[in-house]
């Protein structure tokens, strides 16, 4: 039995099983409507991500360093290890956020303003891009890419400071609050499995666990946790 499966038994219901991971960014822009485009998007994103991580300084051993165990009210942060805000990790997350979340969204917004004839409203009231044959008519006004790229970079940098919260989840659950008796049991389990004393100490910024390489995965996180789908993966070296 792993630590995570052991901790799951302490919580009510049946907490979902998932791989231990650190979320770099959510809302990655992938075309899910056309299988061929989905495949090419996934390949492009993972390839660019490998280039990005290879470009970071090779000045220390661990990209990921685990710290204290903590808990929040949120389902997805019920029980987790804090992760140190390593400069390389933050830089990598910022690059991914800029290229594959902020920039595509900003380009789309600008196109809606400059070229409204390219868009229509679907049956749910959402603004969507017309299919290619529907959007052939009308002049296309160019958008200011240098400005958009600069603004996307600024927004991603701001996100890395105000929102990026690296952590490694151990349990997903709705239980709140965690009482002192359960918390003591959690600490004992972690100590038994990982030999970490005082695992919830505020002074614990490095519990001795960490790594530099690993596997980068692009995951479709829709619906139940057990239904999440790995769209693609790449080894980090």
UniProtKB/Swiss-Prot annotation:
Molecular functions per Gene Ontology: 2',3'-cyclic-nucleotide 3'-phosphodiesterase activity
Active site: 21, 167
Any Pfam family hit: CPDase
Listed GO CC annotations: Golgi apparatus
Disordered: annotated segments: 117-137
Assigned protein family: Belongs to the 2H phosphoesterase superfamily. CPD1 family.
Name of the molecule in the record: 2',3'-cyclic-nucleotide 3'-phosphodiesterase
Organism: Debaryomyces hansenii (strain ATCC 36239 / CBS 767 / BCRC 21394 / JCM 1990 / NBRC 0083 / IGC 2968) (Yeast)
Taxon lineage: Eukaryota, Fungi, Dikarya, Ascomycota, Saccharomycotina
Gene: CPD1
């Amino acid at each position: 039995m792993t630590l995570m499966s052991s901790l799951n038994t302490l919580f009510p219901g049946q907490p979902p099983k998932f791989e231990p991971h650190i979320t770099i960014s959510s809302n990655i822009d992938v075309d899910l409507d056309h299988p061929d485009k989905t495949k090419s998007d996934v390949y492009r994103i993972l390839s660019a991500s490998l280039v990005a991580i290879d470009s970071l300084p090779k000045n220390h051993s661990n990209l990921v360093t685990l710290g204290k165990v903590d808990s929040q009210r949120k389902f997805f942060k019920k029980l987790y290890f804090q992760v140190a805000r390593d400069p390389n990790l933050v830089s990598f997350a910022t690059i991914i956020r800029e290229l594959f979340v902020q920039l595509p969204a900003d380009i789309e917004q600008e196109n809606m303003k400059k070229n409204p004839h390219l868009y229509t409203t679907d049956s749910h009231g959402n603004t969507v891009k017309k299919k290619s044959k529907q959007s052939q008519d009308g002049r296309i006004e160019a958008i200011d890419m240098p400005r958009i790229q600069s603004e996307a970079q600024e927004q991603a940098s701001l996100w890395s400071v105000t929102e990026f919260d690296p952590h490694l989840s151990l349990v997903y659950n709705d239980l709140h609050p965690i009482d002192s008796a359960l918390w003591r049991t959690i600490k004992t389990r972690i100590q038994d499995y990982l030999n970490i004393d005082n695992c919830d100490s505020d002074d614990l910024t490095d519990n001795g666990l960490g790594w530099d390489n690993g596997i980068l995965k692009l995951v479709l996180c829709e619906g139940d946790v057990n239904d999440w789908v790995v769209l693609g993966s790449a080894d980090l070296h």
